[in-house]
From Swiss-Prot:
Widely expressed. Expressed in ovaries, head, thorax and abdomen of adult flies, and in the CNS of third instar larvae. Isoform 2 is predominantly expressed in larvae and in adult tissues that have been tested. The lineage of its organism: Eukaryota, Metazoa, Ecdysozoa, Arthropoda, Hexapoda. One of its GO terms (molecular function) is tRNA (cytidine) methyltransferase activity. Interacts with Psn. It comes from Drosophila melanogaster. CDD domains: AdoMet_MTases. S-adenosyl-L-methionine binds at residues 96, 100, 140, 165, 191, 212. Keywords: Methyltransferase, Transferase. This is tRNA N(3)-methylcytidine methyltransferase Mettl2. Signal peptide: none annotated. Belongs to the methyltransferase superfamily. METL family.
Length: 325
């Protein structure tokens, strides 16, 4: 949904981008799922479930809720030993380096859908762009699946995009991409869980900070520190755009016993970690950081495999929180 403030920022060029992107066919990968938005497909007759590959705004019944809770209880009964848990947390950058070393830039697809879900990222009107500088910072930028579309579609002369990632390999791959523009974009390696960020910009300077499937990869006890620093570097009135895994997502239910580090926090087979949030948890942490809620959506989708007759329930959480003026 477009807010009044965001719609006034969009000129003719910005709206053309949104319309063009809305008509794209979307690729699906592990973490880069297209959110539901305008033109959502809602299942009203259960007999039609296998007519399409996906359905939006799916409501769970009591039986599904109980089954999901039972699956999580089963896979989290046996927690990982402290020594093993410490190794995964300490070596997190190494596991992500290994991940990107194997997959390069092929695993995740560019997030062109961000312009429809977060129109604040769409190009400014030509007259506004000349007069209004913008600074956007992405935490956990990976190989540029957000940054590259931003650079591709915006011709704003005063747009500056920053990005950081745990993984030195990811940053190396991003810098090597044809679409990367070092005049408009600066990326660097940084551990966002540190108390003090080493960044090439001042506090209270960023118009937008983007976090897409990033906070879930961080140890829960360090999450608040990350959001506190987001608040510190947002300008007054600046916006934090966020999307991540929700509680009882299919990915959580599929974990085997022995992969649980602590409640709702798991390690994947490749050594990377993932947490599954509730809306209450996110609202609490964002508010504690000093941010004000503008949007908090639990996005429930049903994906189906029509050949195998499988139903797969996905849960993501999408938020917009603003730093007060």
């Amino acid at each position: 949904m477009l807010t009044t403030s965001s719609s006034t920022m969009l000129g003719k060029y910005g709206w053309q981008i949104l319309r063009r992107l809305a008509s794209k066919s979307w690729e699906h990968t592990r973490q880069r799922k297209k959110p539901s938005g305008a033109g959502s497909r809602v299942l009203t007759d259960a007999r039609e479930v296998f007519e399409f590959n996906a359905w939006d705004h799916v409501q769970w019944d009591e039986e599904q809720e109980l089954a999901a809770k039972a699956a999580v209880a089963k896979n989290s009964t046996s927690k990982m030993e402290a020594e093993q848990k410490e190794r995964f947390q300490t070596d997190a950058p190494k596991f992500w380096d290994s991940f990107y070393g194997i997959h390069d830039n092929r695993f995740f697809k560019d997030r062109h859908w961000l312009f429809t879900e977060f129109p604040e990222l769409a190009p400014l009107a030509a007259d506004s762009a000349v007069l209004q500088p913008r600074s956007i910072f992405e935490l956990g930028c990976g190989v540029g699946n957000t940054i590259l579309p931003l650079l591709q579609y915006s011709s704003e002369p005063q747009l500056k995009v920053f990005g950081c990632d745990f993984s030195a390999r990811a940053i190396e791959i991003l810098r090597s991409q044809r679409q990367f523009d070092e005049k408009r974009c600066e990326v660097f390696v940084m551990d966002a869980t540190l108390d003090h960020w080493q960044v090439p910009f001042e506090e209270n300077s960023q118009d937008i900070i983007v976090m897409i499937f990033v906070l879930s990869a961080i140890e829960p006890k360090k999450m608040q520190r990350v959001l506190d620093n987001c608040y510190r570097y947002l300008r007054p009135g600046g916006l934090l755009l966020f999307r991540d895994y929700g509680r009882y997502d299919l990915a959580q239910l599929r974990f085997k016993s022995g992969k649980c580090m602590e409640d709702n926090f798991y390690v994947r087979g490749d050594g990377t970690m993932v947490y599954f949030f509730t809306e209450e948890e996110l609202r609490g942490m964002m508010t504690q950081a000093g941010l004000q809620e503008e949007q908090l959506i639990v996005d429930r989708r049903l994906q189906v495999n029509r050949c195998r007759g499988l139903k797969m329930y996905r849960v993501w959480i999408q938020t917009k929180f603003r730093k007060p003026l």
